[in-house]
Amino acid sequence: MKLLKISILRQSTFKNKKYNLFKIKTNRDFNPLVIGTKIRRNLIKETKGTKITQASLFVLNKKSKEKLYHSLNEFTNIEEISEKTNEIIKNLERLKIKLVNKNLKKKIICITLTKENSFFKEIYKTIKISNLNQKICTIKSHNVEIKLLLKIEKEKGIKFNPIETINFIIPKKNNENNSSLFLETIRNDQTFTELYQSLKLIYNQQI
């Protein structure tokens, strides 16, 4: 009979990070170095994450008679906005996010920003953001309005992966059937589910 037991020894959050310590126990002998390497490889390869993969910025001058939005390229510098366009895009890419609808793999959203309007108040119904302290931009004038067109995707791969640290801990007593795994991830991820699926796959391969 196969037995694979995963226990949560400790789980905590600090700022925009989640820290998890798991205990892994099995009735099958295995080399802890081999399974540790396989767990890391599998989690990095298979764990899904969510990122803003494309951002288009448009600006409107409310004083202008045209009342048209003009596209901003990465070299555009507007006096009424503290940050350059490329800085705003980099700030957007730094957001640690998760789609509210778990079944969605891709979503395009449009956000309008003004001096009075907060980015996070506009976006909270669509995605969850763990690093709410991440600055996006500062609009200094009431006459300027920015429209953001954001493409958000949920996928596998290093670019999307929410896991930042993986440590496999081998007991000093060399009890190979009883080891621990430490994971540091962004706050909104589904670490336990991904870990269980990863271990189940490795275990069934009869390491």
UniProtKB/Swiss-Prot annotation:
Catalysed transformations (reactions): RNA(n) + a ribonucleoside 5'-triphosphate = RNA(n+1) + diphosphate
Molecular function per GO: DNA-directed RNA polymerase activity; protein dimerization activity
GO process terms (BP): DNA-templated transcription
Record keywords, A-Z: Chloroplast, DNA-directed RNA polymerase, Nucleotidyltransferase, Plastid, Transcription, Transferase
InterPro entries membership: RBP11-like, RNApol_insert_sf
SUPFAM superfamilies to which the protein is assigned, alphabetical: Insert subdomain of RNA polymerase alpha subunit
Quaternary structure annotation from Swiss-Prot or TrEMBL: In plastids the minimal PEP RNA polymerase catalytic core is composed of four subunits: alpha, beta, beta', and beta''. When a (nuclear-encoded) sigma factor is associated with the core the holoenzyme is formed, which can initiate transcription.
Protein name stated in the entry: DNA-directed RNA polymerase subunit alpha
Organism: Euglena anabaena (Euglenaria anabaena)
The gene coding this protein: rpoA
